[in-house]
Amino acid sequence: MQPSARRPFDLATPAPNGLRRGRTTGTCATAAVKAALLRLVRGETVDAVEVSLPDPDYCLEVPIARIEPLASGAVRADVLKYAGDDPDNTDGATIFAEVSVNHAGEVRFMAAPGVGTVTQPGLRVPPGEPAINPVPRQMMRMAVDEVLAGGANPGFDLAIGCVDGERIARRTFNPMLGIVGGISILGTSGIVEPMSLAAWMASIEVYVRVALGDAPEAIAFTPGKIGRAYAAHPLALSKKQVVQIANFIGASLDYAQTALEEDRHRLGTLWVLGHPGKLAKVLDGVWDTHSSKSGMAMGSVAAVAAELGVAAALVEQIKTANTVENVIQILQHQPGAQAFWTEIEQRIAARMQPRVPRADRVAVRLFAMDGTPLGAAGQEAGA
């Protein structure tokens, strides 16, 4: 059942850093949903399915470990999580889906044992919902459509679980985020890119040198995908000039400085573009922003708010916020929100600048999870 016009994504081809890619929990859950649906709707038992990835050009074949009809009339399918060379706590875990007809004409998502439930604001899923992020939900809806192939949709309940997920979740950031009962079903591309090993740091150095190779006026660093669109427009940077640095902010700044020194060049502007959840940690002197090595920067963010005269009640909310995304929500309707985030940007840049003296300017731009500019970027984008 290969989705039309999609090419198979080959996990055997290593990432640019030479490491093996893997399948996200979102892809595993989608594969389990599709296999269970094929048994439930068509009576087919399969040993693998093809999952449509968010990139419309690709699909991914995923092995199915088990398919089992349940006494309730639902069908359960299991998939083994494969993380490649990424140090993922869920590697090897059994992700499963229990799929049943609900006769409500809609797809409903539920947390089976081992998948958590969101209890606090500030995440991409509202409180009370299973911890299944938006992109995996969309992938599962697409799998439903593919199995039905244009036929009537009676509605399905998709209960997603993880064997031993509650124990696995204790080794993740979920307890601090207020996600209770298990792991989260995550992923934005469907593919695990191995980003957290020392080997990935070595590859970042290569990418930094390539970005600086033609002595450009500017390059950009992004911890993740947030900020890439801004790098393309309005900054007009080429893909080669944009380096994804993962959690390794300090090392990446040092790589840039070393390359500029060796080439005896100067850089006009080093842009650092991303979500404040990672970048604000620099205010605390944190240069490796992985959650296992650092907490959230609520204290520093709240201190800036207090200095700028933000109401004391709001400052207290910031101090106790669940995530920095929650802080964005707290401040989004306040008249001084853009000025506040611009100040945060400037302070982060001031901490970074001494590590790259051969850059004339380090400029930080912050964005919400949906890509909305928070500070000065909003002024520039609207100019």
Swiss-Prot record:
Highest rank taxon of the organism: Bacteria
Q: Supply one GO molecular-function term.
A: cobalt-precorrin-5B C1-methyltransferase activity
The EC number on file is 2.1.1.195
Q: Does the keyword S-adenosyl-L-methionine apply?
A: yes
What reaction does this catalyse? Co-precorrin-5B + S-adenosyl-L-methionine = Co-precorrin-6A + S-adenosyl-L-homocysteine
What SUPFAM superfamilies does this protein map onto? Answer: CbiD-like
Segments carrying the region annotation (Disordered) are 1-24
Q: Which Gene3D superfamilies match?
A: CbiD-like
* Pathway it works in: Cofactor biosynthesis; adenosylcobalamin biosynthesis; cob(II)yrinate a,c-diamide from sirohydrochlorin (anaerobic route): step 6/10
GO BP of this protein: anaerobic cobalamin biosynthetic process; methylation
Quote any Pfam family the record assigns.
CbiD
Q: Which keywords does this chain's UniProt record carry?
A: Cobalamin biosynthesis, Methyltransferase, Plasmid, S-adenosyl-L-methionine, Transferase
InterPro entries assigned: CbiD, CbiD_sf
Concerning its family, UniProt says: Belongs to the CbiD family.
What this protein is called in its record is Cobalt-precorrin-5B C(1)-methyltransferase
Lineage here is: Bacteria, Pseudomonadati, Pseudomonadota, Betaproteobacteria, Burkholderiales
